[in-house]
């Protein structure tokens, strides 16, 4: 019934075994009566029953099985089994102290367990509310401004860059006249400077702006309009203005702007200007280094710079062959861009193309790509079967990576590590269904996954390593996102997960496959909220149905949600797996027969009220009984005393068999106790020994109308056959049977065999008859004696085994064994014969 009852097993073991056998025949089961109770105690006790075999009602005391336990409401309840009714009935009996004490403790333990579960649920709810409030507090809390530390190196580099940029727009040249010159010393003795002033860097811009303004005011449609427009472009796309703005931006926002400062400085010296900045998103590390090298060489010699960039491109083509296709293509693309801008810059220098035209060209190219091409940010590298191997960004932008790398170094060090966890790498498999792909794992003889993975499919494909097979979906949980599948034959060696004893907040482990079929293991903190588990972990497609385990490898939940970084799972406990009860062949036949009868009943168009039929039968029986009473009352002298009741002496018990018959039966293997029981049974068929001293009037008992239809149904249909569940037991003692009586004892010729027997076990009966015939013919001579080379005990043991086997086969098919059937009566060989089927004559 429960674990306490299995361990303690109070009461008599014999009574327990008998009670379990009777429980199979009972209309109400002990599992339902004592559901949720403590340990049971079994014992034998008396019960008063009305003897149905006598004409006069009499009370007969029988021994039956008593069962007692403490119910969930702490009530000590006792039931006993009532034969005939085949039902457990509540009764009053003495209290078994150990059972009562343990039962009360069990119920108290269950109450405390429920209380603890409620407290855990409340604690989880409070923790979740605390996390929400803490998040809201952090959101509403006023953040203090972050003061960045003063870095002299950054300021120095920024000052040098500004000085380099402003040096290109300043005019520091001064002219004059030498009036006295010393040829020996090659020096000017008297120099007169001309009146000149240093041109400020903004004078040209102011002059140009005023000129544009004046000319626009005079006449906007003049021929010089295009000149004005070119001046505007020169102002907007001026390299020094753009470089200054970019340097200020990186100075304020970037943690490490040195890389950008170096690029801007080299672009200013080499006159690459905006070209160098515009192509940075297309360059990886090697291409960025090639750009720096080309700009340095370009400052010294343009022709050599073109040669150097081309050599670097060829070298990258040759050396990069060991790299992956995506990385190789990205590197070649970057070096090709470097070679192209070096050539473009050289052509611009030769043709005296203004710098603003080059800048405008790059801006137009980038605008065209953004507005019309719509380039993707990432490229997915897939295999031949469509699996995503990895993703590659279309713009490597190595300079941005360097900035992020430096920022990552500024993060605080971890003060703790994740706990060591036990994983089962071969314990999960991939589920492929029409709705998508997921993960599954084995628990007992079931494969478990999420219900939304299998969808409405009846069968899905399971891939476990190199093995593939189809699995049938056997169960979908009504309230949880859990589905069970039958374990295929090819996956019998798959490791199985075990359930955790308790599910609490703490470290959890998720083992799953991602969409690229890579094994991922994550250890994080999980929080239980009612029937769900929440945790923060990077989740991907294909992880649905993955097992969520403790650090000991015990399963506690099934992963179901995927929001990118936060995950969720549904709690998985043993109660979520339905209990599978094995249906016997007899029960299956009865179910099929019931369905057949229900179908026939549904096809019948004529509906007959069952209550009307019962009333008609009751009226007919009552009318017939009245007629019989009248006829019996009109018969004279019908009432008489029983024979043998008018004598004061007790009737003598006569022998049932003759001496020869008695000895012959002893030789056949029957014991004296067995013959005595058989003789008493034969005498009981002809004599009434209950009231030998009393004189009663023979006749029918008084008739009384039944109270309701229930009494009639119990009287007519309230009996069941109890032989079905009584399994034949194999005897351990071999009876010494004479060889000439083997055929009579083991042959089936003396037993009635029905049509149902032949339909069910015809093959087994034929095999049994042939085996019996072969054994007897090879071990018994024609004169009815054992052969010389035969071991009689071994032959008898073999015959007993065959006899027990055929009876057990009948019992398995729901048929009455031969041990419970009556043999056909044979005429005895003596002249007197057996006891006649009438009472012996009186001695008087």
UniProtKB/Swiss-Prot annotation:
Top enzyme class: hydrolase
Keyword Coiled coil appears in the UniProt entry: yes
Posttranslational modification: Cleaved by the viral and host proteases. The protease is probably autocatalytically cleaved.
Record region (Disordered): 687-708, 822-844
EC number: 3.4.21.-
GO biological process, one term: viral translational frameshifting
Transmembrane spans: 231-251, 257-277, 304-324, 337-357
Keyword match Transport: no
SUPFAM superfamilies reported in the protein's UniProt record: Trypsin-like serine proteases
InterPro entries (UniProt xref): Astro_1A, Peptidase_S1_PA, Peptidase_S1_PA_chymotrypsin
Residue numbers annotated as active site: 452, 481, 544
Keyword annotations: Coiled coil, Covalent protein-RNA linkage, Host membrane, Hydrolase, Membrane, Phosphoprotein, Protease, Serine protease, Transmembrane, Transmembrane helix, Viral RNA replication
Chain segments annotated as coiled-coil in the UniProt record: 109-143
Site (Cleavage): 172-173, 407-408, 640-641, 721-722
Record field: compositional bias (Acidic residues): 687-699
Catalytic activity entry: RNA(n) + a ribonucleoside 5'-triphosphate = RNA(n+1) + diphosphate
Modified residues (O-(5'-phospho-RNA)-tyrosine): 662
Source organism, top-level taxon: Viruses
A GO CC annotation given for this chain: membrane
Molecular function via GO: 5'-3' RNA polymerase activity; serine-type peptidase activity
Stated family: Belongs to the astroviridae polyprotein 1A family.
Protein name (Swiss-Prot/TrEMBL): Non-structural polyprotein 1A
């Amino acid at each position: 019934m429960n674990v306490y009852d299995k361990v303690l097993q109070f009461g008599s073991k014999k009574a327990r075994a008998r009670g379990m056998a009777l429980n199979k025949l009972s209309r109400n089961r002990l599992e339902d009566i004592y559901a949720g109770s403590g340990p049971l105690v079994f014992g034998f006790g008396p019960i008063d029953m009305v003897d149905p075999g006598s004409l006069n009602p009499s009370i007969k005391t029988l021994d039956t099985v008593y069962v007692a336990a403490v119910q969930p409401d702490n009530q000590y309840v006792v039931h006993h089994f009532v034969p005939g009714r085949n039902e457990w009935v509540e009764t009053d009996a003495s209290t078994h102290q150990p059972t009562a004490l343990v039962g009360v403790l069990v119920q108290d333990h269950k109450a405390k367990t429920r209380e603890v579960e409620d407290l855990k649920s409340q604690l989880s709810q409070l923790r979740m509310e605390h996390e929400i409030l803490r998040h809201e507090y952090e959101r509403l809390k006023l953040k203090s401004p972050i003061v960045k530390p003063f870095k002299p190196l950054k300021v120095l580099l920024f000052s040098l860059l500004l000085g380099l940029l402003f040096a290109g727009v300043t005019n520091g040249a001064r002219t004059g006249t030498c009036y006295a010159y010393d040829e020996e010393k090659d020096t000017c003795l008297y120099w007169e400077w001309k009146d000149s002033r240093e041109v400020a860097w903004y004078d040209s811009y102011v002059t140009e702006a005023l000129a544009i303004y004046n000319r626009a005011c005079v006449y906007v449609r003049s021929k010089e309009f295009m000149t004005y427009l070119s001046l505007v472009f020169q102002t907007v796309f001026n390299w020094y203005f753009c470089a200054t703005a970019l340097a200020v931006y990186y100075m304020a926002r970037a943690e490490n702007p040195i890389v950008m400062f170096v690029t801007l400085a080299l672009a200013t010296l080499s006159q690459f200007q905006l070209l160098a900045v515009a192509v940075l998103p297309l360059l990886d590390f090697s291409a960025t280094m090639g750009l720096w090298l080309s700009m340095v060489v370009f400052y010294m010699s343009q022709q050599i710079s073109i040669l150097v960039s081309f050599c670097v491109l060829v070298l990258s083509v040759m050396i990069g062959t060991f790299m992956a296709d995506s990385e190789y293509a990205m590197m070649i693309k970057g070096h090709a861009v470097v070679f192209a801008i070096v050539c473009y810059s050289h052509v611009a220098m030769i043709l005296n193309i203004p710098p603003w035209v080059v800048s405008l060209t790059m801006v137009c190219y980038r605008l065209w790509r953004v507005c019309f091409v719509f380039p993707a940010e990432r490229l997915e590298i897939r295999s031949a079967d469509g699996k995503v191997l990895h993703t590659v960004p279309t713009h490597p932008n190595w300079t941005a990576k360097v900035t992020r790398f430096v920022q990552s170094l500024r993060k605080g060090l971890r003060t703790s590590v994740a706990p060591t966890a036990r994983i089962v790498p071969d314990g999960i498999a991939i589920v492929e269904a029409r709705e998508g792909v997921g993960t599954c794992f084995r628990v007992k003889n079931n494969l478990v996954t999420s219900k939304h993975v299998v969808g409405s499919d009846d069968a899905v494909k399971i891939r476990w390593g190199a093995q593939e097979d189809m699995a049938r979906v056997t169960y979908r949980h009504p309230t949880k996102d859990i589905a069970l599948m039958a374990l295929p034959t090819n996956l019998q060696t798959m490791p199985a997960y075990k359930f955790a004893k308790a599910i609490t907040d703490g470290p959890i482990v998720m083992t799953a496959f991602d969409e690229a079929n890579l094994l991922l293991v994550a250890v994080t903190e999980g929080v239980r909220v009612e029937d769900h588990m929440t945790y923060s972990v990077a989740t991907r497609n294909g992880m649905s149905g993955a097992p969520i385990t403790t650090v000991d490898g015990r399963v506690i939940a099934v992963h179901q949600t995927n929001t990118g970084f936060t995950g969720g799972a549904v709690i998985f406990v043993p109660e979520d797996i339905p209990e599978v009860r094995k249906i016997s062949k007899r029960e299956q036949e009865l179910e099929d027969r019931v369905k057949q009868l229900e179908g026939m009943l549904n096809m019948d168009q004529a509906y007959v009220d069952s209550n009307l039929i019962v009333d008609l039968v009751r009226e007919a029986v009552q009318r017939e009984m009245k007629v019989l009473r009248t006829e019996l009352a009109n018969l004279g002298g019908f009432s008489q005393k029983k024979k043998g009741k008018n004598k004061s002496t007790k009737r003598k018990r006569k022998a049932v068999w003759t001496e020869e018959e008695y000895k012959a039966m002893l030789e056949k293997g029957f014991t004296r106790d067995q013959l005595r029981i058989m003789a008493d049974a034969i005498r009981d068929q002809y004599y009434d020994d209950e009231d030998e001293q009393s004189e009663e009037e023979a006749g029918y008992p008084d008739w009384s109308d039944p109270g309701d239809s229930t009494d009639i149904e119990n009287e007519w249909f309230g009996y069941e056959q109890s032989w079905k569940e009584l399994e034949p037991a194999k005897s351990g003692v071999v009876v010494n049977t004479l060889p000439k009586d083997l055929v009579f004892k083991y042959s089936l010729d003396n037993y009635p065999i029905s049509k149902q027997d032949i339909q069910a076990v015809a093959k087994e009966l034929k095999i049994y008859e042939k085996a019996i015939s072969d054994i007897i013919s090879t071990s018994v001579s024609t004169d009815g004696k054992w052969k010389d080379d035969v071991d009689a005990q071994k032959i008898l043991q073999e015959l007993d085994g065959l006899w027990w086997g055929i009876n057990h086969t009948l019992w398995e098919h729901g048929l009455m064994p031969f041990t419970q059937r009556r043999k056909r009566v044979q005429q005895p060989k003596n002249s007197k014969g057996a006891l006649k089927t009438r009472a012996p004559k009186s001695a008087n």
